[in-house]
Amino acid sequence: MSFSAKVKGEICRYIDISKEEALAQISAIMKVCGTLAFSGRQISFKMTTENPASARLMFTILKDYFDIHAKLMVKKSNSLKKNNIYMVVVTEEMGVKKLLEVTGILREIDGIMSLDYHIDENLVDTEEKKKAYIRGAFIGGGSISNPEKTYHLEFVTHSQEYAEDLGKLINTFGLKAKVIQRKNSYIVYIKEGEQIVDLLNIIGAHTALLELENIRIMKEMRNNVNRLVNCETANLSKTVNAAVRQVESIKLIEREIGLARLPKNLREVAELRLTYPEESLKELGEMLEPPVGKSGVNHRLRKIEKIAEELRTGNF
């Protein structure tokens, strides 16, 4: 089961809600996955989904809150996946006109009916109604990627005005949803992991939220470990390169003028480095008598490298 299906399965269990919340939720579902059909003077409205839990919820809300016994039909998809497509149909005899009016989908102005692509403010004038509306929009046209791979949550709509209204509604909760056009659709999307967690909380997908949070924590831990390993590898590489460079400089001095020509403090460090090429500066310093700190050993080795460089260039 996809992560999207898990989220929808969880939030479709929210059936014990107020009539106002149910109205907000079904309005959002109808706006994002509904189609208005005309046959002569008769009109009907069809909601389409590939998710059986979503279809059951649409049917249940219409029956329990609006006393509408919609038709529930199933057909095979023409796509390669061959999934079932579920259609919830409300006809004129069932009261589709009244439903379209109360959900803010149809508006009658001067006796003329027209589609309203905006979100009716009366449907989302409380916190709970806003949450129910966003939940409905996700049930009807939302999806979320597998969080193991990437963080991406989106709502697909077919109206720019509606997409912008939905984005603004989501952002009243402090989120940063954005709108883009993709072919003939308008997408409201969120890509940041923490914001997706917040949206799952808003729509009531608490089990999915915990699963995503666990995945986020594990990914962050893996990233931190990788960064630490990379950092330690880089530091080790620098230390090894420095030791190799120091040994080469000391051997050059030994070849050209002999280590005996070096001052005692430099000669002692040079001899230790030749004997213990893999030891750290701290460990070399502890071998000296009296012991010398890491910075002191580093200072002496720099002087040795400077002498070697002067020998290479003939300036000694």
Swiss-Prot record:
Record's keyword annotation contains Coiled coil: no
Short name of any one Pfam family annotated for the protein: LAGLIDADG_WhiA
Family: Belongs to the WhiA family.
Keyword Iron-sulfur attributed: no
GO aspect biological process, one term: cell division
PANTHER family given in the database record: CELL DIVISION PROTEIN WHIA-RELATED
Organism: Clostridium perfringens (strain 13 / Type A)
PROSITE patterns in the record: INTEIN_ENDONUCLEASE (PS50819)
Protein's UniProt name: Probable cell division protein WhiA
Its job: Involved in cell division and chromosome segregation.
